[in-house]
Regions:
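Conserved ABC ATPase "signature" region
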Residues: 8, 17-33
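Conserved ABC ATPase signature
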Residues: 37-41
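C-terminal coupling/interaction segments
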Residues: 168-212
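Conserved H-loop
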Residues: 91-97
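Hydrophobic anchor residue at the start of the ABC signature
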Residues: 51
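Catalytic Walker B motif of ABC-type/P-loop ATPase nucleotide-binding domains
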Residues: 62-65
Length: 212
């Protein structure tokens, strides 16, 4: 059975008459898959198929649980960009469960951070970032020379290969960036890095606790 027939059967519709379904298929560039057998679809194409079926329900509240699990980075990125674009001007509420921070940065405006079943933090993304990271962070490679260069500034918890510097205000940010630029150090600025924010939220949650 072709993907087209499976889709029409599940949705109880006919593609040639369903303008909304046609629009979703065009939006996700899925037209070339319609005459294939489902087993012949790639992982990314199967995820598109599932997402189209979900979106056709027009639900006020939709759960996406690890929707890009098993896909390569490039396919994940393209799929999440498409989802973010589709929902941008809509009033639907999405609950997205993901271990990929870049997905949450694209789709989420509120976060619930869990660790081993414990609620670490919950709130608006911007408020959580400010609470655990500051106004902005500057991220650079973790090298001996870089550590020495920024030793007088506040370093946040971060992945081992990175240094993340907290900037409490514009003046501090300008002071740090001036030093980095003067010393020809590559860096990235962020005011929404969910990975580093989550690491520091966990650090604050477990600080002083014996049940880590």
């Amino acid at each position: 059975m072709s993907v087209r027939h499976i889709m029409e059967t599940i949705l109880n519709t006919r593609l040639r008459k369903d303008k909304e379904l046609q629009r979703l298929i065009d939006f996700f560039e899925f037209g070339s898959c319609l005459d294939k057998r489902f087993a012949a679809l790639s992982g990314g194409q199967k995820q598109k198929f599932t997402i189209i079926l979900v979106m056709m329900q027009k639900a006020e509240l939709t759960f996406y649980d690890e929707v890009t699990s098993g896909l390569d980075f490039e396919t994940r990125q393209r799929l999440m960009e498409k989802m973010a674009e589709w929902y941008r001007d809509k009033e639907n509420t999405l609950v997205v469960v993901s271990h990929y921070y870049e997905e949450l940065e694209q789709l989420a405006d509120k976060l619930l951070i869990l660790d081993q079943g414990r609620v670490i933090a919950c709130g608006k993304k911007e408020e959580l970032f400010r609470a655990y990271c500051g106004k902005a962070i500057l991220i650079l490679e973790n090298t001996l020379s870089n550590r020495d260069l920024v030793r007088d500034f506040t370093a946040l918890k971060s992945p081992d290969h990175l240094i993340a510097l907290s900037c409490a205000d514009r003046e501090e940010e300008e002071r740090i960036t001036s030093i980095l630029i003067r010393n020809n150090v590559n860096f990235k600025r962020s005011n929404s890095d969910i990975e580093i924010m989550s690491i520091n939220a966990k650090e604050a949650f477990y600080e002083g606790r014996e049940d880590k």
